[in-house]
Curated annotation (Swiss-Prot):
Origin organism lineage: Eukaryota, Fungi, Dikarya, Ascomycota, Taphrinomycotina
GO cellular component: actin cortical patch; cell division site; cell tip; cytoplasm; cytoplasmic side of plasma membrane; mating projection tip; medial cortical node; medial membrane band
Post-translational modification Phosphothreonine, affected residues: T529
GO BP field: clathrin-dependent endocytosis; cytoskeleton organization; establishment of bipolar cell polarity; mitotic actomyosin contractile ring assembly
Protein name, as recorded: Cell division control protein 15
Role noted for this protein: After the onset of mitosis, forms a ring-like structure which colocalizes with the medial actin ring. Appears to mediate cytoskeletal rearrangements required for cytokinesis. Essential for viability.
Biological source species: Schizosaccharomyces pombe (strain 972 / ATCC 24843)
Annotated F-BAR domain residues: 20-273
Length: 927
């Protein structure tokens, strides 16, 4: 019998060995046994695959282990041993190499003997499974089809029978023609029942035959699957046995290698190894002699009693501890190095000490008891030895710091009253222990004072010579600690200088409000009362500067580099520096107190139109702040609107552009366009819209004009009210105005406001500006430089002479507002005062003045494009791209279009072959 071309004997040539048979246990309804055996065959194959993967990983481990053992055995480190110990170490290395080879063989055997056999068995089992499944698959499908057909025919047969039965029941109630009709239906139903009965019987017989064949074939398939399962289990047993043998072989080889190592170790001879090591490394048997004490005096025949010499030496009191801050100040090299100070010197220093504030009080006289106490304290300072004096002579003579005489009280630190700057300097000196390196240049004052210094130091020769046998360890230590604080220590102290910023090294505050340049930092004085102190400080300024290159403070004003354009932001124009503020560091707490007091003063004020009270309040407040040692620039913090103080960040940089400002700027540009094409546009409206767009722009972070605007603020605030009141008046400038200012202030007031508002003065020369009392008048040298710079600024702005009084004051205010140093609150105060004056009973005069000073420039270009306004260049600018234009300082440009990013579109006027292009708005000033 053949099924699918495979004979029954070939399909099931299996003989089972187990007493339990699959044929007796895999039956059931709907052939459930067949599904169980098929799933078992699949799972058995997956087990074989997992074992093959296990062998692969073990072979990889053995191969890696063998490789590492081989590297360990092949290490070529030198062995400083001899004899049997060397043989033992070499044997261990050799046997380790043998173990590596054994494990390499284990890896190869696992791959060849175990894994290959598993792959072969998997292939063979799959073939047997396919043969057994094919032998029963067709019969299984035929049996399933007959079962379905038999079920359908059975249903049809039962339906026909039920129909015939219903007809027969209905005929009992019918007669006549209706009975004849039902008899016809009964006949047809009987024929259908007969037909369905024949088909049902035939299908049943066929299914019976197929089922019997299926039983026989399934029995054979069960035997085949049982044979496959028995063989698989036997194969796994054999394969894993071989695995154990292979691993055991490797272990045996490892044990053999270990046994060889043990045999080598048994041959170790320690005596021979020691003997051979001595022969190779021995250095001799002679013991070196013991050290002996050699008495210098006995060897040279000298008979000195050291104890007696020590008792004869004079002893001076000296301190072995670290000198305090006062002792360090007293022993500063700015005093005489080796002489005690007399009472006359101390008294002269105390009496001639300069005041530390502009509003100083007279110095109280010092009594003789206080002078004696100071002299006693200074005489208790330890006197350095002659060796120290000799070692410190080059330092003192090479330094540019001169020794102050009796007539120079500004350098006497001990007698001068301490200020806040002194306290901070002393605190920094004690905490950081900084050393100031000596400068290379020597001032003329030092050269002139050499002879006097030599004469003064001769008084101390006896004391110095008498102390030459005194131990100098403690004295040199205290002297080092004293001099290291002032920059006159040894080379090692100079190497430990802490790096400081430029502003700190120059002794200047690093606040962004102090925008002075480096060139004028040491030469400018605060007031005429402090000019002597400033000149002396400038003489010693070079000595406190370090020769080494140090990092530039990020807040220092040095140079603004825009492409090839180098702008000296540290050197502000001279006209804005005629009013120099105090050089003390602005205290944040003082700024906050000034802001609070100013805001309370604003709330108490009843009207902004009262000119005299406002001017007097500002003058008195600035006077009080200057009296307390604060800067006049701090008054910008107290500037507010309608009594509401503006939030201050106390020295923080200005904020960047905000989206609201950009939106307002865009709206202003749109309204300008509508005004140009929707209604008649005048020159004044174009200029006002341009100024409005400039005022809405955020302040530039450039610190160029920080000091100029801060110095301008006090004079601007004092003259703002009088300026707004007298705009409509036409008065010729009389000398009496200047005489009044001189009689009140004592000397002519600097013309910083006049130089910055040159356009206003040029357009209306008849306008008089009433000056208030200056709290800190400047010296003649400062005033002359301001006048010269005012003339220079006036000549550079000749194109602005016809702008009117009110517009003439706008450029400088906008310039200060744009560069961020001059507070916007001060400008809003001026605008409020100007607005209040505009509502005064004299509007006709002001309008008449402005109408007379209308700029004759065109408001439209030749192509009909509207001109937004005119600007004047503050700096030189070199174009970086073809779309930009270059200009020089003083050039006048027309503005045709503005952008939110600060770049404006325009053209230089009164220049042949000029082209249109972009230029930066922070390089120009609105005319």
């Amino acid at each position: 019998m053949e099924v699918n071309g495979v004979s029954q004997s070939e399909a099931a040539p299996y003989v089972t060995k187990s007493s339990v048979k699959f044929r007796d246990n895999f039956w059931g309804s709907e052939d459930a046994g067949m599904d169980a055996l098929m799933s078992r065959t699949k799972s058995s194959l997956s087990v074989l695959e997992s074992i093959d993967e296990f062998y692969a990983k073990r072979a990889s481990i053995e191969r890696e282990y063998a490789s590492k053992l081989q590297e360990l055995a092949a290490s070529s480190a030198d062995i400083p041993e001899v004899g049997s110990t060397l043989n033992n170490i070499l044997s261990m290395r050799t046997e380790t190499g043998s173990m590596a080879k054994a494990h390499e063989e284990v890896s190869q055997q696992i791959n060849t003997e175990l894994r290959n056999k598993i792959r072969e068995y998997i292939d063979q089992t799959e073939q047997q499974k396919v043969v057994a499944a094919n032998a029963i698959e067709e019969l299984y499908q035929k049996k399933t089809a007959l079962e379905i057909d038999l079920s359908e025919k059975k249903d049809a047969y039962e339906y026909s029978c039920n129909k015939l039965n219903s007809y027969m029941r209905q005929t009992k109630k019918m007669t006549g023609r209706e009975l004849d009709k039902y008899n016809l239906k009964i006949r047809q139903a009987a024929l259908a029942v007969k037909k369905m009965d024949a088909e049902y019987r035939e299908t049943n017989e066929l299914l019976l035959t197929v089922t019997r064949e299926w039983i026989d074939r399934w029995t054979e398939v069960c035997d085949a699957f049982q044979h496959i399962e028995e063989y698989r289990l036997e194969f796994l047993k054999t394969n894993m046995w071989a695995y154990a043998n292979i691993i055991s072989t490797a272990c045996v080889k490892d044990d053999e290698s270990c046994e060889k190592i043990r045999l080598t170790l048994e041959n170790t001879n320690i005596d021979e190894d020691i003997t051979q090591m001595i022969q190779n490394e021995g250095t001799g048997t002679t013991i070196p002699p013991l050290p002996e004490f050699n008495d210098y005096f006995k060897e040279n025949g000298l008979n000195y009693d050291i104890d007696q010499l020590i008792s004869k030496a004079p002893s001076y009191p000296y301190s072995s501890s670290r000198p305090s801050a006062s002792a360090s100040l007293a022993s500063s090299p700015t005093r005489s190095a080796f002489r005690p100070k007399t009472s006359e010197t101390v008294s002269s220093e105390v009496v001639s000490s300069p005041p530390t504030s502009p509003l100083h009080s007279p110095v109280k006289p010092v009594s003789n008891e206080q002078v004696e106490q100071v002299t006693e304290v200074e005489l208790s300072i330890p006197v350095p030895s002659i060796q120290e004096a000799e070692s410190q002579k080059p330092v003192l003579t090479g330094s540019s710091m001169r020794r102050p005489s009796v007539t120079s009280p500004t350098f006497e630190v001990a007698a001068r009253p301490l200020t806040s700057m002194d306290v901070r300097s002393s605190h920094n000196a004690e905490t950081e222990v900084q050393a100031i390196p000596a400068a290379t240049d020597i001032s003329p004052e030092v050269k002139e004072g050499k002879n006097s210094e030599n004469a003064i130091t001769k008084d101390n020769d006896d004391i110095i010579l008498s102390s030459q046998l005194q131990p100098t360890a403690t004295g040199s230590r205290s002297s080092r600690l004293s001099f290291s604080r002032h920059g006159h220590g040894s080379q090692t102290s100079l190497g430990s200088i802490k790096r400081k910023s430029i502003m700190e090294r120059m002794g200047r505050p690093t606040s962004p409000f102090m925008g002075s340049s480096f060139s004028n930092m040491g030469s400018r004085s605060t007031s005429p009362t402090k000019e002597g102190f400033a000149s002396n400080q400038h003489a010693t300024g070079a000595s406190v500067q370090s020769d080494e290159l140090e990092d530039i403070d990020p807040r220092a004003n040095v140079v603004l580099n825009v492409g090839p354009n180098m702008l000296s932001v540290g050197e502000a124009p001279v006209e804005s520096t005629s009013k120099e503020e105090d050089k003390d560091v602005p205290d944040p707490i003082a700024n906050a107190m000034a802001e609070l007091s100013s805001s309370m003063r604003r709330r108490q004020s009843t009207s902004v139109d009262d000119e005299a009270p406002v001017s007097l309040s500002k003058t008195s407040s600035s006077t009080r702040l200057n009296g307390l040692g604060y800067h006049s620039r701090n008054t910008s913090i107290a500037s507010d609107i309608d009594g509401v103080p503006k939030k201050s960040t106390l020295g923080a940089p200005p904020a960047a552009h905000t989206s609201a400002q950009m939106q307002r700027m865009s709206n202003s540009f749109a309204s300008q366009t509508k005004q140009v094409f929707g209604e008649q546009r005048t020159e004044n409206s174009a200029r006002e819209s341009l100024r409005h767009s400039r005022s809405n722009m955020s302040r530039s972070p450039s610190p160029m004009l920080s000091r100029r605007s801060s110095t301008l603020r006090p004079s601007f605030e004092r003259s703002a009210s009088s300026l707004s009141v007298r705009q409509s008046d036409v008065v010729s400038p009389a000398p009496s105005t200047r005489a009044r200012g001189q009689s009140v202030s004592g000397q002519q007031r600097p013309s910083s406001s006049m130089s910055l508002y040159g356009e206003y003065n040029k357009s209306q020369p008849q306008l008089s500006m009433q000056r208030s009392v200056s709290p800190n008048p400047l010296g003649p040298n400062r005033r002359s430089s301001s006048v010269l710079q005012s003339q220079k600024s006036t000549s550079s702005n000749t194109s602005n002479r016809n702008n009117g009084g009110y517009s003439g004051s706008r450029p400088s205010s906008e310039m200060g507002h744009r560069y961020g140093s001059m507070s916007g609150r001060s400008m809003r105060q001026v605008s409020q005062r100007s607005t209040s004056r505009a509502r005064s009973p004299e509007p006709t005069n002001r309008n008449s003045v402005q109408s007379k000073n209308v700029d004759p420039r065109a408001t439209f270009t030749a192509e009909g494009e509207p001109i937004l306004g005119y600007v004047i260049a503050l700096y030189d600018y070199q174009a970086q791209i073809p779309e930009e234009i270059s200009f020089q300082k003083g050039d006048t440009l027309m503005v045709l279009r503005t952008q939110e990013d600060g770049w404006w579109d325009g053209e230089i006027i009164n220049v042949p072959n000029s082209k249109r292009g972009l230029f930066p708005s922070n390089f120009v000033q609105t005319v």
